[in-house]
Amino acid sequence: MKKFLCAFAFAVILSGSAFGASESEMKRMSVFVSNFTEVGMYHIDVDDISDSELAFFGIWHNWHNNFKSRIQRCPNKNCPYGGYIIDKKYVAESIKKYFDTEIDHQSTENPKWGYYDGKRYYHFEGATGEAVQARVTQVRKRGDTIIMRGVTYWPDNDEIEGRPFTATATPYKYNGKNTWAILTLEVED
């Protein structure tokens, strides 16, 4: 029994210490991770992310969460790049808030998902569908890094089994509020 306890304690030290997150903190972490899963970003590594991927996140995060206040119809009749626009400042703001980084504005890999006009707006075609959410069930801390584990889920369909995920983030202040900046997210295939 002593060998088991020693091995368990050693594993905890190697994997990071338990982090006593409250229920409300776990809920905030779940919402934080859901900001990425709801736009279909299941594999994130900030060391390898491109400005195109950041632009994609900034556009679609606002589509899901700030539609009425930040998304507008394209004023150009038969707009060749989609029926909606968003000001680049809102895209940059979302990227700063969730990634704690700046963006060199450019179009996404698929221009229909976000064409940058080189001036002020991203143009894109809207989309519908149910957003995949995340539920954080375990939290650990390793140095300044928070490790969140959990499962994805579909809010309107409990019968579909979600996929496990691991996310890492670093705490920081955004506009005077405590939050996190994503470092990695890996949703199992």
Residue ranges, per PLM feature:
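Intrinsically disordered regions, especially transient/low-confidence alpha-helical propensity segments
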Residues: 10, 57-60, 110, 151, ...
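Feature targets compositionally biased, intrinsically disordered low-complexity regions
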Residues: 15, 19, 39, 57, ...
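Positively charged n-region of N-terminal signal peptides that target proteins for export
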Residues: 1-4
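Exposed beta-sheet edge and beta->alpha loop/turn motif
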Residues: 124-189
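Core segments of small alpha/beta cavity-forming domains
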Residues: 21-122
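Hydrophobic helical h-region of N-terminal Sec-dependent signal peptides
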Residues: 6-14, 18
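Extended, non-catalytic scaffold segments that flank or surround catalytic motifs
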Residues: 16-18, 23-39, 43, 136, ...
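Generic structural microfeature
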Residues: 15, 90, 164-166
